[in-house]
Amino acid sequence: MRPALSDYRHLASGKVRELYRIDDEHLLFVATDRISAYDHILSSEIPDKGRILTAMSVFFFDLIDAPNHLAGPPDDPRIPEEVLGRALVVRQLEMLPVECVARGYLTGSGLIDYRKTGTLCGLTLPPGLTEASKFAEPLYTPASKAELGLHDENIDFAATVDLVGEKRAAQLRERTLQIYTQGADHALTKGIIIADTKFEFGVDPSGELVLADEVFTPDSSRYWYADAYREGQVQPSYDKQFVRNWLTGPESGWDRAADQPPPPLPAEIVDATRSRYIEAYERISGLSFAEWIGASA
């Protein structure tokens, strides 16, 4: 008989995830259908989103050549029925206070910083770059982890050294770029550009660096259509940039600068977001989402 969710002690809530303790060494990592944008948790949810994020992470954890935090399969008997398909049993780690961002292309906050200073996280970039310019080599551009509701801040490598020490900072940079390259190369064979992504790492009791949280999901990554890529233009995407674009467009009526909660998403935006997430999973994995645990039709 599977345990009930109430059998586990709730430890923490994030923008999208809930964390529960199973025992002294294992946690239950639950992905909800919540969606966040611009440091707000939206009132609207995206049906099946938690399952899509979980399915995508499981696929990439299996693909990537790096130790990860999984401690059981997605149908592990320790996972309660009510969260089956959107929860994972993971190892408890000492999490590191760095968002490890890898960028293959210039966009988002990186483009904003570049336009202001010509640099990104302490790295001097060549002149003449524009929206969606591809870097000669992927860049490691870390950020500090912010409290819930606050914004992560881009930092340079020296600041990472201050946070975790020189040896661990160098290891984070190397591992981040290795994982990004492997995942982005795979996605490109499926017609998808992973423009950038973020990883989180922890350390196990032996001191080994372990990939944790989520990996290459549409929440943590920018997914672009490879056949539609055009430098100098905002790219059509599979990820939650679609939601951000609606929120900052005239139809939403939302004034981001006023620091008011975003409005509910219209049904068509909810449906289109769900469809984009599913399409990203199916194209990248080659699997049918309908066959994932508990997926709705």
Swiss-Prot record:
InterPro entries the record matches: SAICAR_synt/ADE2_N, SAICAR_synth, SAICAR_synthetase_CS
Enzyme Commission number(s): 6.3.2.6
SUPFAM superfamilies: SAICAR synthase-like
Any Pfam family hit: SAICAR_synt
GO function terms (MF aspect): ATP binding; phosphoribosylaminoimidazolesuccinocarboxamide synthase activity
Keyword check for Iron-sulfur: no
Reactions that this protein is recorded to catalyse: 5-amino-1-(5-phospho-D-ribosyl)imidazole-4-carboxylate + L-aspartate + ATP = (2S)-2-[5-amino-1-(5-phospho-beta-D-ribosyl)imidazole-4-carboxamido]succinate + ADP + phosphate + 2 H(+)
Pathway recorded for this protein: Purine metabolism; IMP biosynthesis via de novo pathway; 5-amino-1-(5-phospho-D-ribosyl)imidazole-4-carboxamide from 5-amino-1-(5-phospho-D-ribosyl)imidazole-4-carboxylate: step 1/2
Cited Gene3D superfamilies: ATP-grasp fold, B domain, Phosphorylase Kinase, domain 1
BP-aspect Gene Ontology terms: 'de novo' IMP biosynthetic process
Highest taxon of source: Bacteria
CC terms in the record's Gene Ontology section: cytoplasm
Alphabetical keyword list: ATP-binding, Ligase, Nucleotide-binding, Purine biosynthesis
CDD domains named among the record's database cross-references: SAICAR_synt_Sc (cd01414)
Similarity annotation: Belongs to the SAICAR synthetase family.
Protein name: Phosphoribosylaminoimidazole-succinocarboxamide synthase
Organism name: Mycobacterium sp. (strain KMS)
Gene of this entry: purC
